[in-house]
């Protein structure tokens, strides 16, 4: 893989800049946007970026940092899903707490925002409190967003309980957008000043990157990733007016800046040190880019990937037509097409060939996989196994120089598994999934040296690209994710079944 980003340089620059910002205050409330862990988008568009860079940065500053996690009560009620992991936001909070503790980081508490006694939220609060985790309930802020006098009063932020913190940097994070991070920071700022403490607010968001051009593919890829939020990148006019310098930000931050500035000035009783929304940020990711061409190409591929993802989400009913069209339009505006993703044409051509040969209207799943050396392999679904499993077996055979004719998994192992699924468990679909095939392969590896060699090649699939001609099940997608494979799908179901397609 060609590297376009210097991770070590970025970590050094970023930690230094945060410490410089905190020096101005007794306490800095740092709103962390995006993903704190497993930032797969950043990893894809910035080749060389560590997906856990943010948490490693915090680990570096661990003596000075504690963390507050926000979760919007409405997201608990409607079981909002974190798309890249397929888990609900409340479950993601539990995972996040475990991961933060694994990095020796102190989790202060969980804040439930816009709380109004929702039943499912109360169950989640009980779960946390009975495990010894502090929970604060923040109701919707009266007067927000326009009535600044009410917002900054005992009727507004004053109604929220004060969260006791002890360290100079308080990171406020969440599973996703719209979780109430900003409101929590400002509420704390209000309480700090009421207590006579000098506190500050800053924002750490990786995208859009303020110091790369507005129409750079890296920033366009961010728009593509947030089509459902209707985010649009813009030139920060406040920054240009103040410094005569061009900086990129996004519409929500620019639109909310005048009110946010007034709220901060009302809380502190003095003129804000921030002249623009860009001023509020501490992001230094742009300084880690070492090869702009590599980043541009990776970002273009991400735009195509996002168009596929949005098309599948539209088919599943998760997004509206406007979102679907916007993702497609962004791709077309960059003069890109689906076929610019190398694995798309081989998958589609093989699927068309199979359909012609079978002379049936049935859809056959074909998965194409591009290896590190540029080789493209395909696998098809059959009565025995899914297309994902077939292509993985073909890939490990390729890496291990094992002939196609050699079976890695003995029928003695496969047949009892299929019988178990069909007869004992009564499964409608008996074809083995990718995960089931990998488990069967690991069993064979205990007695078969060839299978053992093939098993050893699985880590080589990390970073590979794949495309499926049909929508994959959640389990198949998660198995590919665990293997480190980026997969896209055509927005077509394998059959007319409504339940068994999932």
From Swiss-Prot:
It comes from Clostridium botulinum (strain Langeland / NCTC 10281 / Type F). Belongs to the UPF0371 family. Pfam families: DUF1846, DUF1846_C. This is UPF0371 protein CLI_0399. The lineage of its organism: Bacteria, Bacillati, Bacillota, Clostridia, Eubacteriales.
